Design a protein with these regions (language model features):
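Short cysteine clusters
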Residues: 199
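A conserved hydrophobic position in a structured secondary element of the catalytic/binding core
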Residues: 202
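Cell wall/extracellular polymer interaction/catalysis modules
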Residues: 18-196, 205-248
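Sec-dependent N-terminal signal peptides
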Residues: 4-13
Length: 248
């Protein structure tokens, strides 16, 4: 009997390890679709729900991903999948499902109509992208009177139009694994064909419309997948039906 109980428990744990998907309390979801794993561009679309059914609330918008395409990231879902996984400097955007963090900006206020947690970036802010350093993939604030020797290389972008507004995509964010990828955001693209190193980038008006739409109480998430993976996983992961996703 004890052996049977142990087997049942292990089976339940195995099922739970692969059943992660969109959290039940997530009411805002951004869906990103790439044509294939090696695609450096695709489309995003915003969805929301009051009950169980997702509804599209925006048309699909063209965006850029990492120059080399996608690889599985570490978030709510995707990290246990077989295949290529995101690594630092691989120029791939993390695929899977991810919670969204706060907005980072050079401004001291959000755009009119926005109501979401934000942080004003200053000269003292760093985001650690070197896997050899403590606090990898963490935002920290240093003492400018006594900066550490690594600070200049890890300092957050200053006065860069592409980073004037950005939203954290929480890849590898909880107990970060050194070398598994860092500093992943939605941010402004430098041009229609200027790919990022792993972020999802778009024209500023599209990004600002997303910032105005987001609400912390809706527990917003981002799902980024190649089209074939989306069709295979949408039901198990609680994603919008493929017929609703115009990018497919």
């Amino acid at each position: 009997m004890r052996r049977l109980f142990t087997i049942c428990l292990l089976c339940a744990l195995a099922r739970s390890a692969f059943s992660a998907g969109v959290p039940a309390d997530c009411r805002q979801l951004i869906v990103g679709i790439a044509d294939a794993w090696e695609s450096g561009e695709g489309r995003i679309q915003c969805f929301q729900r009051d009950g169980k059914a997702w509804q599209a609330v925006s048309p699909p918008q063209r965006v850029l991903f990492g120059k080399n395409g996608l690889a599985w990231g570490i978030g709510v879902a995707g990290q246990k999948e077989p295949g290529r996984h995101k690594a630092e400097s691989d120029k791939r955007a993390p695929a899977g499902i991810f919670a969204l963090g706060k907005v980072y900006t050079y401004e001291t206020a959000l755009p009119p109509g926005a109501d979401y947690p934000f942080y004003t970036v200053s000269a003292a802010d760093a985001w650690i992208e070197d896997p050899a350093l403590p606090h990898y993939n963490e935002h920290i604030v240093i003492d400018l009177k006594n900066p550490p020797p690594w600070f200049k290389k890890q300092q957050m972008k200053q006065g860069d139009f592409a980073h004037h507004w950005k939203i954290e995509i929480r890849h590898n964010a909880d107990s970060p694994q050194p070398g598994a990828g860092s500093a992943i955001f939605f941010h402004i693209q430098r041009g229609p064909n200027k790919h990022s190193s792993g972020c999802t980038t778009m024209p500023q008006p599209i990004l600002l419309s997303i910032i105005r739409w987001l609400r912390a109480g809706a527990n917003p998430h981002y799902a980024l997948l190649p089209a074939a993976e989306y069709r295979a996983k949408w039901k198990a992961w609680g994603l919008p039906e493929p017929d609703l996703v115009s990018a497919l």
